[in-house]
Amino acid sequence: MELTEKNYKEDFCAKKISVIIPMYNAEKYIKKTLNSIIEQSYQNWEIIIIENGSEDKSPDIIREYEKKYPEIRMIKGSGKGPGPARNKGLKLAKGDYIVFVDADDYLPDTEIFRKYISIAEPTGADIVVSNYVRLWEDKILPASKHEAFALCSPSSEEFRFRGFFSIGTLSYVWCKFYRSEFLKKQQISFSENSYAEDKLFNMQCYICDAKFAFLEDVGYVYRKNDASVSWQYRSDSTENWFKIAYELKGWIEKKQKEPEKYASLIRYLIFFASFFDAKMEYMQYKNSLRAVRKTLKKYGTNPVGKRVFHELADRKRHLYINQRMWEIMIRTFSFGMKQQWYILLAVGIKMLITQRVDERLSDTGVRE
C-alpha cells in the first residue's frame, strides 16, 4: 500500500498505539522485537511488557531499554501464561489502538503503524488485519494470505471457515490492529486457558460484529520458537479445547446472538482440535496409533464432540464453505468419528502426517 499525503492525515498522529508484549525467557529475541517497534516512523506509542517470571536475562535487557525510552515499561505478571498477561496489559493501556506482539517475533516494516492507522481511521474499522510471514531458523517463508477470505462477506460461513480455520489468520492476535474503544465497550478480554486463548479472543470479537479491514502488506514476522507454549506438548489439550467450546457457547448466549448462526464456529473448532491433538499425540508418543486412538475416543465420547461429529457427518446439513477438498475431509472424518472407527482414523492420520499433507492444515505447522 503506497502512502501519500492525500491518504495519510497528520491529525492521525494524535492517536496513541499501545503495544502489549507478554515475556518469558526471551533474551535471544527481545531486542529485535523492541527495536522493530522503536524504529517505527509513527512515534505516538507505548510499550507495555508483562514479565512472566523469566529465568534468563530478559528483565535486565528491558531495564536498560526503560532507562533510554520512557514509553517502555515492564510490569510483573502472574506467570500464568500469555492470556492473563495480555489482560494486565489491556488494563494499563492508554492507547486508542492495541497491538499485540510476542516477545520472540518482530515487525518487519517501519511504516506498519502508519499503514494500520491510515486504514483504521477513515474506515472506522475495529480490527485491521495485515498479512504475515514465518521465520524458520533464519529462513523467511511465506504464509497463506488473507485475500483468500477477505473478499467474502464477514457474515458468511466461508469467511468464518477460512478466516479462523483453513487459512487461520483471524485466529491470531498478532498481525492485528485493534480499536481499544471496541474492546472496552464489548468487555472482551483473554481467557485463562493454557492454549489458544487468542483464537477465543478473536472469535469473541467476531461475534460482537467487529468491523474488519484488511491491509495487503506484511505486518508481522512469526518465529517458530520450540520453547514457546505453542510448540509444547500438553496432556490437557483436549480438555482445554472443550473448555474453549463451552466458553464460546456462553459468550454467544451472553451477547444474545442467534445460536445457529455461530454454531459452525464450535463445530469447526472441535473438528480441527481433534485432528491437531491426534497429530500431537502421534508425534509425542513416537508414532503410536494407540495414543492417537485414545485421543480420538476422548473427542468422540465427549457429549459436545459426539454432537458435533454427528452434525458434520449429516449430509442433509449443507456446509457453506465452497471448498470441495475440505468438505470431503470433514464429512469423512466426522462419519468415522460418529461410527467410532478410531483405529481406522488413526491409520489415516498417520498417512497424512507421513505424506506431510497435515502441514496444509496450518501455516504455523509446516515442518522444514
Where in the sequence are the language-model features?
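Membrane-interface aromatic/basic loop that binds lipid-linked glycans or pyrophosphate carriers
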Residues: 2, 283-368
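Cell-envelope/extracellular polymer assembly enzymes that use nucleotide-activated donors
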Residues: 15-18, 36, 46, 200
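Short, well-formed alpha-helical segments that are part of the catalytic scaffolds
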Residues: 25-39
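Acidic helix N-cap motif at the loop->helix transition within catalytic regions
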Residues: 28-31, 56-65
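A conserved acidic beta->alpha catalytic loop
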Residues: 43, 51-60
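Glycine-rich, basic loop-to-helix element that forms the pyrophosphate-binding segment
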Residues: 74-93, 103
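Donor-binding/catalytic cores of nucleotide-activated saccharide
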Residues: 82, 103-214, 220-236
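Short aromatic/hydrophobic "clamp" motif used to bind/position activated sugar donors
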Residues: 98
